[in-house]
Structure formats: C-alpha cells, structure tokens
Amino acid sequence: MMQPLPSSCERAILEQFLKAEAMALWAVRAAQAQDVPPGVLQFLRRHEEEEAQHLKQFELLLGMNSHGKTALPRMPSQWRVLAVHLYGYETVGLEFARLLVGLRPDLISILKDEEVHVGFFEHEVRTILTQGGPVADGARQAAQSWRRRLPPTVNRYLHDESFAPFRDELQRHILGVVDERFLAVGLSAR
C-alpha cells in the first residue's frame, strides 16, 4: 500500500485523471464496436455513461476541457484480447483512483466506480480462462504482450515534476499491483 501523496501532487493527479477518463471513454466507445458478449455490451454502455460523467467532473475541477478525438482508437477485435486490455487499464486506473482519494476523499465515488469496472473485467477474464485451450492461451499471450508495454505507459502517466520524488516507488507499486492481479486471476505465472 502506498503512502498518501502530498497535496503538491493534487493537480497532477487530477490532470492525469482528466486524460485517463478521456482515453477510457474513447476506449469503451471503440470496444462497443467489437464483437463482445451481449452482457458485456450492456455493461460497456453503462460504463461509457459513467466515464462521460467522470470526464465532466474533472473538466469542472480543473477548469479545462479534455482534448476531443476525431476517431476512435483501435481496439483488439478478439474478445479475449480486448478483455485483457480493458482489465489491465482499469486496474491501473483503480490505483490512480486510490492515489486520488488519498488527496481528495470527496472523490470516493470515482474509486467506487473503478472498483466496479475492475471487478467486471476480472470476472470476464476469469470466464475466458475457464474455457481453457486456445482461448485461454490467447488471453495469457495478450496479457504478456500488454504487460511488456506497460512500464513506459505508467512512466508517461507519472511524468509531472511533482511526482519526481515518488516516481520510482509509484511505478513499482502500480506495476506490482497489475502483476499481482494478473497472477491471481490466472493470466500469468510467477
């Protein structure tokens, strides 16, 4: 468990959340265009609404708009790969939400939503893995590939100078949490 960050990191965390919520909103929209199970599509629609609300909340808090995209990001077309990507990014988002609530306890609803999102995708990943065979192997390969690309992504998220004294510890913590979750759900082995 990380120690709470000092108040000097508040704006940087809020700005990072603004970017992350914008990215999540676009990723969830793009995911809806893929071939996903019916129950997942319903969740993604609700998830999109929540992300849009979060985005507006952060825009108001910061007094700035997020940068709108003109095209949806490319998302994996295979559900087993898409589920791993969404689970991974939601796990990272959950850790940032925990950091945020350490600075802004009034934003606990963001943390609660992130816990629901992670729980949903964790359940979906477990469902995929219980199928065994090539489907489960494909999910594990996707997790390995996604995890290899994660350190530079987390480093970008922590680029703000206010994070400098904590950057290494934060990066180790976030990557460690992802590794623990991937191990616990069965996406990776030690």
Give a label for each model feature:
Residues 1-190:
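Non-heme di-metal
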